[in-house]
């Protein structure tokens, strides 16, 4: 069997991006600079009216060869301009809109985007996929945040990779509902409910919402050189409804993903900023109600080691699972094909590699790039008719470049 090679288009993209890297002096990470939306509530911002503009422009190429998912490209941007007013030192109100545009696309399916959307011919928007944005952010104490409306969601939750894919930042709608965050020296707790699909009487689809809990414990002393952390995470998704009596599909469905693990970061005594990192997690899947998915229970184990050098991060990992299905994660971490749910993988195993670079460009501006490899080891596929097929090693690649801007303009102070 021929050795899989990186596609020439990806090689050219990576070479061009690497030549653009400036000299770096401090450590940075792609998720914190490019994917995470910053809080805009300021203790000294009482009486301020501001215009805040957040934008992520991206080009991501997925050269996928796995049995789990086919390849595709995401070229485009999303833009979220909002007006914010802070009537109190601990309360901020925001209103605006979210607009998603893919280069070369003129019509957009008019539905909730929970990943790369499926085409719905008769229900479309033109030019952009547009949604209203409203957020009420209340901070009753220094450590507690309560958010209603548009949440600080997606990558802000800090979910582990088998449970949540950072690519959702490029294709999914802002999360909306309610959120509570509690932060102390030893723990960060983030709990939220995201209402994904609302139904009216006699609607033809199901309501859908998700509940999440992301906890990160930090048992190490502040002065300790090696810092440990313990992620404990939970995700539920429910689909159902009582007033949609004419819907074709009325089966109630409830699914669970959970993860626990341990990780560390160890800075080294070197002339340039260098740190070693590691993380091991165990993940679970459970079909609490319904029969839509082929498995009722499953689990997966993921371990990875890495290094942070300047503004770069490199990681290598190993994943294996049994009947595991990820609700919001990269499909490579699942044991079922998202293109054909009747095709299942028997105890799949995978090697992963990750390289990233991220840097601030100034206040409110940052950019980054990443490259990922998913090497699925030989695996047995089971099809709907009961036949089996042995599939050899499949190597998938993904690479992207991103520009994140989030400037804030003071319009008036009362």
Residue ranges and their predicted role:
Residues 30-49, 85-93, 142-143, 186, ...:
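Short loop/turn motifs that connect adjacent beta-strands in outer-membrane beta-barrel proteins
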Residues 53-61, 97-103, 150-155, 184, ...:
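Transmembrane beta-strands of outer-membrane beta-barrel pores
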Residues 54-78, 108-110, 121-122, 388:
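Surface-exposed strand-loop-strand hairpins of Gram-negative outer-membrane beta-barrel proteins
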Residues 91-140, 161-162:
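Surface-exposed loop and membrane-interface regions of Gram-negative outer-membrane beta-barrel proteins
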Residues 145-216:
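Surface-exposed coil loops of outer-membrane beta-barrel proteins
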Residues 158-162, 290-295, 299, 306, ...:
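Outer membrane beta-barrel transmembrane domains
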Residues 393-414:
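Outer-membrane beta-barrel "beta-signal"
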């Amino acid at each position: 069997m021929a050795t899989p090679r990186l596609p020439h288009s990806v090689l050219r993209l990576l070479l061009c991006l690497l030549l653009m890297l400036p000299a770096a002096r401090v450590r940075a990470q792609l998720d914190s600079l490019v994917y995470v939306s910053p809080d805009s509530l300021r203790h000294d911002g009482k009486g301020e009216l501001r215009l805040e503009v957040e934008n992520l422009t991206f080009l991501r190429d997925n050269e996928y060869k796995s049995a789990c998912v086919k390849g595709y490209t995401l070229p485009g941007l999303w833009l979220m301009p909002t007006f914010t007013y802070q009537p109190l030192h601990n309360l901020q109100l925001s209103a605006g809109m979210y607009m998603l545009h893919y280069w070369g696309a003129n019509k957009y399916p008019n539905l909730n985007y929970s990943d790369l959307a499926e085409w719905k011919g008769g229900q479309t928007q033109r030019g952009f996929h547009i949604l209203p944005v409203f957020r009420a952010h209340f901070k009753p104490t220094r450590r507690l945040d309560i958010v209603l409306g548009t949440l600080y969601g997606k990558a802000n939750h800090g979910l582990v990779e088998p449970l949540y894919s950072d690519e959702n930042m490029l294709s999914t709608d802002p999360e909306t509902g309610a959120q509570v965050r509690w932060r102390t020296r030893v723990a960060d707790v983030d709990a939220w409910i995201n209402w994904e699909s609302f139904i009216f009487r006699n609607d033809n689809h199901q309501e859908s919402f998700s509940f999440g809990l992301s906890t990160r414990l930090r048992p190490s002393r502040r002065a300790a050189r090696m810092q440990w952390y313990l992620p404990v995470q939970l995700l539920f998704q429910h689909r159902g409804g009582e007033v949609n009596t004419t819907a074709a599909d009325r089966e109630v469905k409830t699914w669970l993903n959970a993860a626990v693990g341990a990780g560390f970061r160890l800075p080294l005594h070197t002339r340039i900023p260098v740190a070693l990192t590691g993380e091991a997690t165990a993940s679970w899947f459970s079909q609490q109600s319904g029969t839509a998915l082929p498995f009722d229970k499953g689990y997966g184990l993921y371990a990875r080691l890495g290094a942070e050098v300047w503004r770069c991060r490199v990681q290598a990992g190993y994943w294996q699972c049994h009947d595991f299905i990820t609700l919001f994660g990269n499909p490579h971490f699942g044991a079922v094909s998202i293109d054909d749910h009747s095709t299942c993988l028997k105890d799949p195993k995978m090697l992963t590699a990750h390289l990233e670079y991220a840097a601030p460009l100034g206040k409110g501006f940052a950019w980054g790039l990443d490259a990922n490899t998913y090497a699925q080891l030989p695996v047995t596929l089971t099809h709907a008719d009961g036949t089996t097929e042995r599939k050899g090693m499949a190597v998938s690649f993904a690479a992207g470049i991103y520009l994140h801007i989030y400037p804030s303009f003071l319009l008036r102070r009362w």
